[in-house]
């Protein structure tokens, strides 16, 4: 699974990135950080939903030949992204979201 740090439209909240990295480390999930100089996701829209902003992050699946007819992913990466998402949602209420 990839943990988004930034793309062309957003910089993810450092607390969300740290939270997902912490979960992945505890559960021994393979992850990599995603930094995209071009392209984007709906993460920016979610961050801007509230006047004061929102804590937002994103999980993605490493892909080869994206947007091509030969696009490929590894099954373990798909499973890892699902597991990271599930664990992140299940333990969201336990994390200290205050500024450090």
Predicted feature residues:
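Active-site-adjacent substrate-binding region
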Residues: 2-82, 88-100
């Amino acid at each position: 699974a990839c943990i988004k740090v930034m793309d062309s439209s957003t910089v993810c909240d450092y607390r969300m990135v740290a939270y997902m990295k912490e979960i992945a480390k505890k559960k021994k999930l393979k992850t990599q950080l995603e930094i995209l100089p071009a392209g984007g996701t709906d993460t920016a829209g979610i961050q801007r939903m509230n006047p004061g902003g929102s804590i937002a992050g994103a999980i993605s699946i490493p892909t080869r030949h994206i947007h091509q007819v030969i696009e490929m992913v590894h099954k373990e990466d798909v499973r890892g992204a699902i597991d990271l998402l599930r664990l992140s949602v299940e333990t969201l209420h336990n994390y200290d979201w205050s500024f450090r």
